[in-house]
Amino acid sequence: MAVMEVACPGTPGSAVGQQKELAKAKEKTQSLGKKQSCIFKLEAVEKSPVFCGKWEILNDVITKGTAKDGSEGGPPAISIIAQAECENSQEFSPTFSERIFIAGSQQYSQSESLDQIPNNVAHATEGKMARVCRRGKRHGKARKKRRKKRSKSLAQAGVALAKPLPRTPEQESCTIPVQEDESPLGNLYARNVSQFTKPLGGPGLGHLCFKKQDEGLRPVLPRPELHKLISPLQCLNHVWKLHHPQATGPRPHPTHPFPYSGMPHPFPFYPLEPWKPYMLDSAVLDKLAGVSGQRPLPGPPHLSQLAHGDSQKPLPGPHLESSCPSRGALEKVPVEEYLVHALQGSVSSGQAHSLASLAKTWSSGSAKLQRLGPETEDNEGVLLTEKLKPVDYEYREEVHWMTHQPRVGRGSFGEVHRMKDKQTGFQCAVKKVRLEVFRVEELVACAGLSSPRIVPLYGAVREGPWVNIFMELLEGGSLGQLIKQMGCLPEDRALYYLGQALEGLEYLHTRRILHGDVKADNVLLSSDGSRAALCDFGHALCLQPDGLGKSLLTGDYIPGTETHMAPEVVMGKPCDAKVDIWSSCCMMLHMLNGCHPWTQYFRGPLCLKIASEPPPIREIPPSCAPLTAQAIQEGLRKEPVHRASAMELRRKVGKALQEVGGLKSPWKGEYKEPRPPPQDQATCHQTLPTPPRENPPAKANTDGAPEPQPPLPPEPPEPSKAPALNLSKEESGTWEPLPLSSLDPATAKGPSFPDRRATLPELELQQLEIELFLNSLSQPFSLEEQEQILSCLSIDSLSLSDDSEKNPSKASQSSRDTLSSGVHSWNSQAEARTCSCSTALARGRPTDIPSYFNGVKVQIQSLNGEHLHIREFHRVKVGDIATGISSQIPATAFSLVTKDGQPVCYDMEVPDSGIDLQCTLAPDGSFAWTWRVKHGQLENRP
């Protein structure tokens, strides 16, 4: 209990007590000039102010305190209860009640902006009003006369008298709603109180007690150990006065008076630093700043200027640069910006929303990163589990945690390793992503998700140019790796994993999160294969609450894996959660057949085929149960409105699993050859359990009734029919006259396939290919759709991997596993070195072309200033890239250097994080080049 003592005349000392926090007020004190034989009665203070001028506020302190008779066994004294005492010895921090008594205004504040700020009175009932009780009047006539005389004398002296208040203490009489002391704001100012609790120097700034002097009391400085604060308003005013004692001149009268006009403005100390507000602090400060609506506060710079650091005029005192976000004086700063400001530059344990807020500053376009540069060794982040412990606000690789070899997986933009915390010994998976290719959606979308079908996130830390994303380690690897090991999966196990993936998608879609890249490589399995969980949110998207989707296809970014793309994605139409349903059914075809959909029938850019061809339901194995085939067809409807939702499809998959007898196949069985494509068109018709469902998107019927089917596209020819083309062996080795839209992969891996690469007629074939695409575009689509699909064609096309070329028995097993994307793509293909070096901008080169979704990112500035954005295979060499773009460079001889002009070796492999180069001239008479490309041929200086 905090107590302030006032000694009485004729007493040797004063009773033992504690002192309440006192605040500054106005100017001088006025003594009370009458002796009393016993204690001062509180009733005498009600009508007659003891203190005037600067210390007039002490009248309110005394009148709102609790007076008791101190004559029991000791010298008489007045004990004023300043603050309630907490039973558990918890330190009290100054806060506000809902109705604040305004000094000098004779009223309580009715501001609604402070209605959420609790009053930490110990063990009070939350939301209830304190009971008002008054004692009966027992005053004699003599005492009334004395009060009347004293009031008249003070009125003649020009001193305003305070309105009489209840005789009972504030805790008993004030009708102020209070809260339990367990309020989350109970220790709001405890973190910053240390910088305000130093004793103030100077006679006008300290706290006062009073001693007898002649007929009245004079103020003296108290003992320093009794110093405490009263409220945030008063303590902040103390600090400002301490730093700016000269700023005591008259202040202009504001247009909109501050409600607490009876006391100095609470936040005039703008230049004080360092003070980094925490999240809860900023919430309270926002309330205080907006206490008078959105109007500016009077006096010195108000709170918004303090937080925003945008004062219109300099204040006295040393200038200290504000570290808070800079905003306009009248603009409110979101709490999230204060939170991010507090998190930057350190690694701490926190919540998911803190990590999501901090991750937004890691994007490549962040102003802070552009200012600091990508190679800074800053270490900042948020860890979401206690098993990963930062040390001294840092969490660095090889210092606080270490990785284990070999790596778990690799994608287009990063690698996945097993890691171990050196302090706790906890092991999990870590994704190492370059800052240039990091997408903030990876963390924003999955932070805070708690579903067994979603790989949990353990935190993320930025260390220099790398972002390390920690997540649960599932020992079973990826579903794509399992398909690689088993060839193809049994129907029951494929249904089992599809059902779990749909359960995870249902969880995401109810939270308006679009995964964007559902495929077998992004489904991780437990060590026994009983649990499947979705990972890799690098292409995730938060959908709008109104349900209106947006196009995922942009000029420099295409989400997902090409073979799993929905038609609305490749055509640039608005997308919603139905995109994931299409991709999940494509993953189902991958599990049943052992290869990606579309790849058995078409070669080249698949975007056109996905947009123009019917859904790939003909790839459903004929051995599938009817309910299984029906479930796949429900998810492969071309029109999203007719496509099943995640919940609907999950129920259908569950019924199909029951139809086949449940999960009975072993977790890892014998290798089974992938299913070959149908041999003829008749077989294809027989494999469709419900043929009327295969309709083009423009003719989809809303009631689901069967409609006449259009002619099916040409089917791939049988391998035995290839010699029927009447081509000589020499011609067949020169180029392939087969229609590119129906090329069977088996025909592409014959003995003449390697010889085809070095022939000139391939250029004519490339031209015919483009003309064929243009002709097919002119029929079913509008002009806008044609332009969108043509933009996809300018990217690049698929190619057979070297593994399928070297091992024809596993050609269909190759299944384009390099078609990976995102931050965390578990590449299930063996790391065979590819010999392809062509790009989307070098179609004239007769070699295989890597997928846009797999290759590393290469950016080259041409001689005329144009930028070429290229996707290449992993481990491709710089010299091969230069040779591939030679037809696009307007120079006879050129070489490649870095952006700052440093030379690079022609045999240097492009890192997974990508590379940024520029062209430079390499004439014969120059000695600046060590290698060059001249007339399309690589030359090395001897």
UniProtKB/Swiss-Prot annotation:
Its main location: cytoplasm. GO terms for biological process: cellular response to mechanical stimulus; defense response to virus; immune response; non-canonical NF-kappaB signal transduction. Residues 136-152 have a biased composition (Basic residues). It catalyses: L-seryl-[protein] + ATP = O-phospho-L-seryl-[protein] + ADP + H(+); L-threonyl-[protein] + ATP = O-phospho-L-threonyl-[protein] + ADP + H(+). Keywords: ATP-binding, Cytoplasm, Kinase, Nucleotide-binding, Phosphoprotein, Serine/threonine-protein kinase, Transferase, Ubl conjugation. Residues 403-655 are annotated as: Interaction with ZFP91. The active site is at D517 (proton acceptor). Residues 707-720 have a biased composition (Pro residues). Residues 402-657 form the Protein kinase domain. Its EC number is 2.7.11.25. One of its GO terms (cellular component) is fibrillar center. Lymphotoxin beta-activated kinase which seems to be exclusively involved in the activation of NF-kappa-B and its transcriptional activity. Phosphorylates CHUK/IKKA. Promotes proteolytic processing of NFKB2/P100, which leads to activation of NF-kappa-B via the non-canonical pathway. Has an essential role in the non-canonical NF-kappa-B signalining that regulates genes encoding molecules involved in B-cell survival, lymphoid organogenesis, and immune response. Could act in a receptor-selective manner. This is Mitogen-activated protein kinase kinase kinase 14. It comes from Mus musculus.
